[in-house]
C-alpha cells in the first residue's frame, strides 16, 4: 500500500472507531493536516449522526463547512466527546510531535478540552524516541531571537519557518537535533520560555488511542 492508501485506511478506521460515540448532541473535535482532511471526508458521510464539530484550524473549518458540517467556536460548546487528529511522530507511550502544519496551539487546546483523543497515523510515524521530526515551537514574533537562544541551551538547533504565520498571528521555530528522552519534561521546559506560545510536544496531554495504518492492517495502541 502507498502512504496515501494507508492514510485513507486509517481515516476510515477512525470513523468506524468513533461512530458508536455519536449522538444527536455530540461534538467532534477535528484536527489539521492531510490525514485529518481524509477523516473529514469520512465524517461527512455520517453528518446526520452528530451535532457538529470544533476545528483546530481555519483550513479544517473551511473543509468541514464545504461538506455542510456545522463548525462551532470552542467557547460555545460544553464538551468535546472525541478529538481526531494526525501526528508527525508518536512513541510507544502515545506522546506525540505535532505542528508540521503550524496548527499546534489550537490542536493542543482542542485536545485538552476533549474527553478522548484519537490519533491517526501511518506506520512510518511510530518511533522509539521522538525527535527525528523537527519540533515546532509557536512563538510571539518579537521574541524569536530570545526563544531561539534558549532553545539552543536545551540542545536544539532552531530554524525559523520562513513565510509562515499561524492562525493566531504568530511565527514558528522548528527545532532540529533533539533526542527527546523525557517528552513531558521537555514540553514543560520549552513552554516555560518567555515568548513561547506552546510547542509541538503532546506529552502532558498525549493521545488516548493511536490508530496506526500498516501494510498488514490497522493496529490499535492504547495507553
From Swiss-Prot:
Q: Which Gene3D superfamilies match?
A: 3.30.70.260, 3.40.50.1360
Identify the Pfam families for this entry: Rib_5-P_isom_A
Q: Which reaction does it catalyse?
A: aldehydo-D-ribose 5-phosphate = D-ribulose 5-phosphate
Q: Which GO terms describe its molecular function?
A: ribose-5-phosphate isomerase activity
Copy the pathway line from the protein's UniProt record. Carbohydrate degradation; pentose phosphate pathway; D-ribose 5-phosphate from D-ribulose 5-phosphate (non-oxidative stage): step 1/1
Residues engaged in binding substrate: 32-35, 85-88, 98-101, 125
Which principal EC class is assigned to this enzyme?
isomerase
- Give the keywords, sorted: Isomerase
Q: Which GO terms describe its cellular component?
A: cytosol
The residues responsible for catalysis, as annotated, are 107
Q: Does this UniProt record's set of keywords contain Isomerase? A: yes
A Gene Ontology biological process noted in the UniProt record is:
D-ribose metabolic process
Q: Which SUPFAM superfamilies match?
A: D-ribose-5-phosphate isomerase (RpiA), lid domain, NagB/RpiA/CoA transferase-like
What Enzyme Commission number(s) apply to this enzyme?
A: 5.3.1.6
Subunit annotation: Homodimer.
Q: Which family does it belong to?
A: Belongs to the ribose 5-phosphate isomerase family.
Q: Which PANTHER family does this UniProt record tie to the protein? A: RIBOSE-5-PHOSPHATE ISOMERASE
Chain's role: Catalyzes the reversible conversion of ribose-5-phosphate to ribulose 5-phosphate.
This chain belongs to the protein called Ribose-5-phosphate isomerase A
Output the lineage of the source organism: Bacteria, Pseudomonadati, Pseudomonadota, Gammaproteobacteria, Oceanospirillales
Amino acid at each position: 500500500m502507498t502512504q496515501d492508501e494507508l492514510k485513507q485506511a486509517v481515516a476510515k478506521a477512525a470513523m468506524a472507531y468513533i461512530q458508536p460515540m455519536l449522538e444527536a448532541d455530540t461534538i467532534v473535535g477535528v484536527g489539521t493536516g492531510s490525514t485529518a482532511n481524509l477523516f473529514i471526508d469520512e465524517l461527512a458521510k455520517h453528518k446526520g449522526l452528530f451535532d457538529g464539530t470544533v476545528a483546530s484550524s481555519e483550513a479544517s473549518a473551511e473543509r468541514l463547512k464545504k461538506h455542510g458540517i456545522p463548525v462551532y467556536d470552542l467557547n460555545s460548546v460544553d464538551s468535546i466527546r472525541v478529538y481526531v487528529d494526525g501526528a508527525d511522530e508518536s512513541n510507544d507511550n502515545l506522546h506525540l510531535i505535532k505542528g508540521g502544519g503550524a496548527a499546534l496551539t489550537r490542536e493542543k487546546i482542542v485536545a485538552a478540552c476533549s474527553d478522548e483523543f484519537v490519533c491517526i497515523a501511518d506506520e512510518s510515524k511510530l518511533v522509539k524516541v521522538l525527535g527525528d521530526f523537527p519540533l515546532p515551537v509557536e512563538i510571539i514574533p518579537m521574541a524569536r531571537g530570545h526563544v531561539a537562544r534558549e532553545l539552543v541551551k536545551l540542545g536544539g538547533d532552531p530554524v525559523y519557518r520562513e513565510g509562515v504565520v499561524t492562525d493566531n498571528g504568530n511565527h514558528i521555530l522548528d527545532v532540529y537535533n533533539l533526542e527527546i528522552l523525557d517528552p513531558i519534561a521537555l514540553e514543560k521546559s520549552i513552554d516555560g520560555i518567555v515568548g513561547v506560545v506552546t510547542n509541538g510536544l503532546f506529552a502532558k496531554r498525549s493521545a488516548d488511542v493511536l490508530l496506526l495504518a500498516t501494510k498488514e492492517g490497522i493496529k490499535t495502541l492504547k495507553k
